Amino acid sequence: MMQPVINAPEIATAREQQLFNGKNFHVFIYNKTESISGLHQHDYYEFTLVLTGRYFQEINGKRVLLERGDFVFIPLGSHHQSFYEFGATRILNVGISKRFFEQHYLPLLPYCFVASQVYRTNNAFLTYVETVISSLNFRETGLEEFVEMVTFYVINRLRHYREEQVIDDVPQWLKSTVEKMHDKEQFSESALENMVALSAKSQEYLTRATQRYYGKTPMQIINEIRINFAKKQLEMTNYSVTDIAFEAGYSSPSLFIKTFKKLTSFTPKSYRKKLTEFNQ
């Protein structure tokens, strides 16, 4: 007896012809709390880079976590959808026309790579991207040059990823500790003591572990989490810089401003002003 054929749900296709208006790139910066597009695929190439926050993408059936500085590259033939379970996330989304990509970038693409692989930008490049986004008038010709360069960086990271030295897997206890430190009650007050307690290790052991696996001290990790939180507050609320400083766990606004500028190259006030100008 023949078994009934069960058809898989059809996957929607986002089409270059509907989005690009004849241009080489389709560029958006999103502040997202939920996915509108759902499960979909494209007839063009795409990458997404996380500027602020964290979220999940499910790519070809595999769910991966993306945090600030992470990106994924979605080639033709892959399908994906996003899940925003950690609140608002700010994303640079770049679509590249099939013709332009295959003319300029395809020869650089690795012969074989996994679409669900998460890649990390280095801090200097991420700071550069944020600086340009905050200062560039995206209606002028500088946009295309900037996006071409960022796309080259993305493809270059894919090209060299397999050549990188394989580092030890991060221990589960350390992953769990860093994950829990994203909770506001953990990073806002007595953050270092909280991190040590969550790890169930001595501070010295924890420091050696974070430096080995993340290349950072516990306080550097804490400050990145705090500043990421503060950026979301500056983007999404009208709270004063002083209020945000205390909410993020800093004992004084001046220390907050100094740390914010060190990690982003902007003061909190100028960061908010640039965002306002960009969104107008």
UniProtKB/Swiss-Prot annotation:
DNA-binding region positions on the chain: 193-214, 241-264
One example of a Gene Ontology biological process annotation: negative regulation of DNA-templated transcription
Domain HTH araC/xylS-type positions: 168-274
UniProt cross-references to PROSITE patterns, sorted A to Z: HTH_ARAC_FAMILY_1 (PS00041), HTH_ARAC_FAMILY_2 (PS01124)
Superkingdom field: Bacteria
Induction remark: By N,N'-diacetylchitobiose.
Key words, A-Z: Activator, DNA-binding, Repressor, Transcription, Transcription regulation
Pfam families: Cupin_2, HTH_18
Keyword ATP-binding: no
Transmembrane annotation, as ranges: none
Molecular function (Gene Ontology), one example: core promoter sequence-specific DNA binding
Residues of the Cupin type-2 domain: 29-81
SUBUNIT field: Homodimer.
NCBIfam families: PRK10296.1
Physiological role: Dual-function repressor/activator of the chbBCARFG operon. In the absence of the inducing sugar chitobiose, together with NagC, represses the chbBCARFG operon for the uptake and metabolism of chitobiose. In association with Crp, and probably in the presence of chitobiose 6-phosphate, induces the transcription of the chbBCARFG operon.
Protein name per Swiss-Prot or TrEMBL: HTH-type transcriptional regulator ChbR
Organism ancestry: Bacteria, Pseudomonadati, Pseudomonadota, Gammaproteobacteria, Enterobacterales
Gene for this chain: chbR
